[in-house]
Amino acid sequence: GVRMSILVKEDEGRIRVSIRSRRGTSANGCARQFFNGGGHENAAGGRLDVPKDIPGIEAAAEYIERHTHIYLNGDNE
């Protein structure tokens, strides 16, 4: 089943993310580790700044997919 969902919005040269998770998966942990953010255990938010975190807006989807996979699976694939 779905453990975490991420809503993505472009806003003035940065990417804003809104993260929601089910009990047992920390939205806050993911936001703090990969998205310069934080919040509550199952509802958090963050951002990706261009070019500090990603080279351009077009790189956001790949970054989010890769780092969410790392967070949820504890690996680097």
Predicted regions and their residues:
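Glycine-rich, acidic loop segments that terminate in or are immediately followed by a histidine
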Residues: 1-77
